[in-house]
């Protein structure tokens, strides 16, 4: 459930189409957001929505579904030129994601990210402002 705008709606990660889908509570389509790399999960805190993308980044959206930030963006290395691989830890760089499968907000706004990589990797992103 997504209530960031003040009105509840259903938010869906559509990995097959690389989109986020939004429906009203009766199941009627409201909005489709394109341009996501295998969105894996959603979490909200206040007016923000957190979208971990298996294609190497975390996206934050505001209550109007506008992109506020893209965190740890590593799409170029992981998806396009394939120089980073989830089974090869020596290719991973601090501050860059490889395969974020799940993420959630802590009550204070920190973000925890779990990546689906060979050894597993959990990252804490501390809220700074």
Feature names for model-found ranges:
Residues 1-129:
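Eukaryotic scaffold repeat domains enriched in small/polar residues
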């Amino acid at each position: 459930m997504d209530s960031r705008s003040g009105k509840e709606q259903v938010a869906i990660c559509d990995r097959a189409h690389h989109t986020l889908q939004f429906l009203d509570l009766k199941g009627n389509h409201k909005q489709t957001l394109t341009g996501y790399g295998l969105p894996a999960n959603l979490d909200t805190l206040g007016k923000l929505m957190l979208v971990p993308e298996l294609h190497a980044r975390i996206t934050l959206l505001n209550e109007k579904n506008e992109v506020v930030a893209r965190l740890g963006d590593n799409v170029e290395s992981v998806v396009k030129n394939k120089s980073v691989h989830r089974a090869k830890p020596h290719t991973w760089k601090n501050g860059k994601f490889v395969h974020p499968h799940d993420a959630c907000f802590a009550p204070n706004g920190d973000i925890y990210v779990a990546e689906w990589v060979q050894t597993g990797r959990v990252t804490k992103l501390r809220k700074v402002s």
